[in-house]
Amino acid sequence: MIDSYCYHPIHNRWQGIRPVSSPGILPTVVEQSGRGERAFDIYSRLLRERIIFLGTGVDDQVADALVAQMLFLEAEDPEKDIQIYINSPGGSVTAGLAIYDTMQQVAPDVVTICYGLAASMGAFLLCGGTKGKRLALPNARIMIHQPLGGAQGQAVDIEIQAKEILFLKETLNGLLAEHTGQPLNKIAEDTDRDHFLSPAKAVEYGLIDRVVDSLTGGGIVKEG
């Protein structure tokens, strides 16, 4: 007998954008030293400054990379902030929760900075940064909504997946309520459909703490 059940991963991703697993363009920088020239890809160079980029959709591969970078930076210096720049349409809920849990567990404060778009799981991770250190650039856009997914096959299999997606929806809504200070019923209402916010509105909502109007050298955020 052939099993006709087909599992569809549960996502928290804006469908207006197709996520990619890796950057299409990878600039390099060259440094001079007493030993000569040394070339780095730009992301490796910025990692030395404790800056991590989430500039793609969220999947297991991306989650593994971000978790590994955070653990490495924690081992390097458990007291110095980690900065995560986010421009992401979202993606896998379970992969996103793996990143989120690591953000909560590492010793350093995690500064989250939205540039471009933080949608779905991207917005959830933005909101999950250390309180007081969740930021957005002036023309960024932020969007929250409920998870999406599906299943096909026998009725019992579909029922199992329906229960799982409802569980994840309640989990995400509860965490958003905790981080924003909004009532759970308002989170549930606002995430029922795509809900876009400007940075200023996101501050009012509690998704972020302030809008950045300038950045100093080294990626350190200056009060605006």
Swiss-Prot record:
Keywords: Cytoplasm, Hydrolase, Protease, Serine protease. It comes from the Bacteria. GO terms for molecular function: ATP-dependent peptidase activity; ATPase binding; serine-type endopeptidase activity. It is found in: Cytoplasm. Its main location: cytoplasm. One of its GO terms (biological process) is protein quality control for misfolded or incompletely synthesized proteins. Its EC number is 3.4.21.92. The active site is at residues 120, 145. It catalyses: Hydrolysis of proteins to small peptides in the presence of ATP and magnesium. alpha-casein is the usual test substrate. In the absence of ATP, only oligopeptides shorter than five residues are hydrolyzed (such as succinyl-Leu-Tyr-|-NHMec, and Leu-Tyr-Leu-|-Tyr-Trp, in which cleavage of the -Tyr-|-Leu- and -Tyr-|-Trp bonds also occurs). It holds the Pfam family CLP_protease. It is an enzyme of class 3 (hydrolase). PROSITE patterns: CLP_PROTEASE_HIS. SUPFAM superfamilies: ClpP/crotonase. One of its GO terms (cellular component) is cytoplasm. HAMAP family: ClpP. NCBIfam families: clpP, PRK00277.1, PRK12553.1. Fourteen ClpP subunits assemble into 2 heptameric rings which stack back to back to give a disk-like structure with a central cavity, resembling the structure of eukaryotic proteasomes. Cleaves peptides in various proteins in a process that requires ATP hydrolysis. Has a chymotrypsin-like activity. Plays a major role in the degradation of misfolded proteins. Belongs to the peptidase S14 family. This is ATP-dependent Clp protease proteolytic subunit 1. It comes from Prochlorococcus marinus (strain MIT 9313). The gene is clpP1.
